[in-house]
Regions:
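A conserved acidic beta->alpha catalytic loop
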Residues: 161, 176-180
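Short, acidic, metal-binding catalytic loop of nucleotide-sugar glycosyltransferases
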Residues: 160-169
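Acyl-donor (CoA/ACP) binding surface of acyl/acetyltransferases
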Residues: 2-4, 10-13, 50-144, 148-149, ...
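Structural signature of beta-strand start/N-cap positions in the alpha/beta core
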Residues: 143, 169-171
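Conserved GNAT-fold acetyl-CoA-binding loop/helix
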Residues: 15-34
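Donor nucleotide-sugar binding loop of glycosyltransferases
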Residues: 151-154, 179
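A short helix-loop-beta-strand connector motif used in the catalytic cores of GNAT acetyltransferases and
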Residues: 36-48, 57
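Hydrophobic/aromatic residues located in beta-strands of well-ordered beta-sheets
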Residues: 104, 172-174
Length: 180
């Protein structure tokens, strides 16, 4: 239960509470129940970031259908080093590899400028909300990559070959090297 205790301490840090939508301190017994439920929930993934054997952050995704809501936090000593951006990028990669979801979603308070910048830098779509901002990002589960050679016939063949694709959550990437 060391992860449970770490997450409890992290969740109740002043800065984490300030950026959370639930700002009150959480009693350990409530947190312990929440943690036990999350561990059993197939729609939740939690990753603990460690450095030199010490837990320094967490990132979580809670899935509803094909969309997963992101929550993340770093302990005070780990902030300002680019780890949040790295942690969210790694989460995207793992969720894509596991086929966990096809879209990510996050809510950020208007005063949480650092998180806003992170989601913007990772290519999330930003929407203004009453509380601040919401961020969404489509993460295709696989890509179909086709090369064309500056030829409309090659491009047409590439499009025809995937037109009747029946798998969900895919994208077509067409590369054109410009040769004639």
């Amino acid at each position: 239960w060391s992860d449970c205790r770490f997450l409890f301490r992290l969740r109740n840090e002043d800065e984490v509470r300030k950026n959370s939508f639930q700002t009150s301190e959480i009693p350990y017994s409530s947190h312990e129940n929440w943690f036990a439920q999350k561990l059993q929930d197939v729609n939740t993934v939690i990753y603990i970031l460690e450095r030199n054997g010490q837990a320094i952050g967490q990132v979580r995704a809670d899935r509803q259908e094909r969309t997963a809501e992101i929550s993340y936090a770093l302990c005070r000593e780990a902030r300002g080093r680019g780890l949040s951006r790295w942690m969210l990028s790694e989460l995207e990669n793992r969720l894509r590899e596991d086929g966990f979801c096809s879209e990510l979603y996050a809510e950020v308070k208007s005063e949480n400028i650092a998180s806003q910048k992170i989601f913007q830098s990772l290519g999330y779509r930003e929407k203004i909300e009453e509380y601040g901002f919401s961020y969404t990002k489509h993460i295709p589960l696989f890509s179909i990559l086709m090369c064309t050679y500056h030829s409309s016939a090659t491009l047409r063949n590439a499009l025809d070959s995937v037109r009747h694709q029946t798998r969900q959550n895919w994208e077509l990437v067409i590369l054109d090297n410009g040769s004639k």
